[in-house]
């Protein structure tokens, strides 16, 4: 602890990046990579959350993660697609605000979202 002009400053690491923000950036990169292989995905329709209210963003993202993005029988790309989908399914770090809101807010179920093709789903 350093005392400077009557104020107490804790000696900690510099502002560490927000874990949630880093994770979201990583997920956006994964989605961009999946778009390259969209023609190699199983054409099953998927629930695609759109126009999600801020307080339901975590719930909508959970629906996105639960979607059955599956590689079609495409040989070598199958492994790449499977790895990207696995990375998409990793849990997001929770925030304190989310923990409070989860008990207060009712958000739409995954089944209530319009179903779209994998290409539209990844947009």
Curated annotation (Swiss-Prot):
Span of the signal peptide: 1-10
GO cellular component: extracellular space
Molecular-function GO terms, alphabetical: cytokine activity; cytokine receptor binding
Domain of life: Eukaryota
SUPFAM superfamilies in UniProt: 4-helical cytokines (SSF47266)
This protein's UniProt keywords: Cytokine, Disulfide bond, Glycoprotein, Secreted, Signal
Alphabetical list of InterPro entries matching this protein: 4_helix_cytokine-like_core, IL-15/IL-21_fam
Disulfide feature: 56-107, 63-110
Subcellular location: Secreted
GO biological-process terms attached to the record: cellular response to virus; germinal center B cell differentiation; positive regulation of immunoglobulin production; positive regulation of natural killer cell mediated cytotoxicity; T follicular helper cell differentiation
Residues with glycosylation annotation: 77
Similarity field: Belongs to the IL-15/IL-21 family.
PANTHER family: INTERLEUKIN-15-RELATED, INTERLEUKIN-21
Function: Cytokine with immunoregulatory activity. May promote the transition between innate and adaptive immunity. Induces the production of IgG(1) and IgG(3) in B-cells. Implicated in the generation and maintenance of T follicular helper (Tfh) cells and the formation of germinal-centers. Together with IL6, control the early generation of Tfh cells and are critical for an effective antibody response to acute viral infection. May play a role in proliferation and maturation of natural killer (NK) cells in synergy with IL15.
Protein name: Interleukin-21
């Amino acid at each position: 602890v350093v005392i400077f002009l009557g104020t107490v400053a804790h000696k900690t690491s510099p502002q560490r990046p927000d874990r949630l923000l880093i994770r979201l950036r990583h997920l956006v990169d994964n989605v961009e990579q999946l778009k390259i292989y969209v023609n190699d995905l199983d054409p099953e329709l998927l629930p695609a959350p759109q126009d999600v209210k801020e307080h339901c963003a975590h719930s909508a993202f959970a629906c996105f993660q639960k979607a059955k993005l599956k590689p079609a029988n495409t040989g070598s790309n199958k492994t790449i697609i499977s790895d990207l989908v696995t990375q998409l399914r990793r849990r997001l770090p929770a925030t304190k605000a989310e923990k409070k809101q989860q008990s207060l807010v009712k958000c739409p179920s995954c089944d209530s979202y319009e179903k779209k093709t994998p290409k539209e789903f990844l947009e």
